[in-house]
């Protein structure tokens, strides 16, 4: 994750009475089994927001507003508890599968579950704030990370994330 580097870079904002609010894109490489939802190389965007009295409600409302704005409509979103080492509590946001709406047990995108994990998020762990020399007794914040490829996949009905790296011009030229 990039959040500690971002927190260090912008922590002076807090001394000026301003929040830390940053969105950072990056290229990610992972050792993953490849399928319609997973690729070993992809683009990710991470976001952090730190200020006084930031809470889980702020996190969920911010992400729901972003998703509604990006997709242009209110979405059926599921927020589940999850584990990420740098946030506590942590959550996983999932969207209702736009390809089968949970009605196809053979759906390659949601595996018949009806939901597609879209992003991970949570409240920044106090130890992460301390490592960035931010007092966790005075400040709280949230962080999230989302694959850009998956955002685009869901928006444009692309059933296989591997198309992005395929180099096929007929696929790429439609955008």
What function would you assign to each model-found segment?
Residues 1-175:
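TRNA-recognition modules of translation machinery and tRNA-sensing kinases, especially anticodon-binding
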């Amino acid at each position: 994750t990039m959040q500690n580097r971002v927190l260090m870079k912008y922590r002076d904002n807090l001394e000026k009475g301003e929040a830390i609010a940053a969105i950072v894109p990056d290229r990610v490489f992972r050792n993953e089994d490849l399928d319609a939802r997973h690729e070993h190389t992809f683009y990710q965007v991470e976001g952090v927001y730190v200020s006084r009295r930031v809470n889980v409600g702020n996190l969920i409302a911010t992400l729901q507003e972003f998703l509604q704005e990006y997709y242009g409509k209110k979405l059926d979103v599921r927020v589940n508890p999850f584990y990420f080492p740098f946030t506590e509590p942590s959550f996983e946001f999932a969207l209702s599968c736009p390809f089968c709406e949970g009605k196809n047990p053979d759906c390659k995108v949601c595996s018949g579950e009806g939901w597609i994990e879209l992003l991970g998020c949570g409240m920044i762990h106090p130890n992460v704030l301390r490592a960035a020399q931010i007092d966790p007794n005075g400040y709280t914040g949230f962080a999230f990370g989302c694959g850009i490829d998956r955002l685009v996949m869901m928006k444009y009905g692309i059933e296989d994330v591997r198309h992005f790296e395929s180099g096929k011009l007929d696929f790429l030229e439609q955008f």
